[in-house]
Design a protein with these regions (language model features):
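Core catalytic lobe of class I
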Residues: 1-180
Length: 180
């Protein structure tokens, strides 16, 4: 197989890959920003201040009164992140073969939001599993140590997998003798 290394903004690269790799990629693994606000070399904090969010979304009526009260639970913490991940997942889906699969790493901050977006992009019926893996423990947590992360798995087309009887697991030798 040929290897390809492309450096650039991932959205631009995904758009570029559409030309040559549309429907040709068997498996994709992505590890997107977790929206934690930590100091990484890439943007990992997609929150806006309450005033920025209110201004952008037209959250005041004609008299200048706020149209919602609880600024800590509104979309300003997720809207930009959702827009960022949604567009990239759509482009990634286009690259997958009909029997292709995507794995997406995430932590507890956005796993539920990501699942909702993936259900829309890939379809709920194409959901395979939510894998939970044990991460390293530093034993420096203030209250409780979160020691796992998630990997969401989706088929591009589960119906294609069924119709073509594609097997992900094979029976182990001797298993029939045990259960006979």
């Amino acid at each position: 197989t040929e290897n390809l290394y492309i450096e650039g903004d991932n959205l631009d690269v995904l758009k570029l890959l559409q030309e040559s790799y549309l429907g040709k990629v068997k498996m994709i693994y992505i590890d997107p920003p977790y929206n934690t606000g930590n100091d990484f070399i890439y943007k990992d904090d997609f929150t806006q201040s309450a005033s920025e969010y209110a201004e952008d979304r037209g959250s005041f009526d004609d008299e200048g009164n706020r149209m919602f009260k609880n600024t800590d639970t509104n979309g300003r913490f997720h809207s930009d992140w959702c827009s960022m991940i949604y567009s990239r997942l759509l482009l990634s889906r286009n690259l997958l073969t009909d029997d292709g699969v995507i794995f997406i790493s995430i932590d507890e901050n956005e796993v539920n939001t990501l699942k909702t977006i993936c259900d829309e992009v890939f379809g709920e019926s194409n959901f395979i599993a939510e894998l939970i893996w044990s991460a390293g423990r530093k034993n420096d947590s203030k209250y409780i140590s979160v020691s796992h992360e998630y990997i969401l798995c989706y088929f591009k087309n589960a119906q294609y997998i069924k119709e073509h009887q594609i097997i992900w697991r094979e029976k182990k030798q001797g298993l029939d003798n045990i259960y006979a």
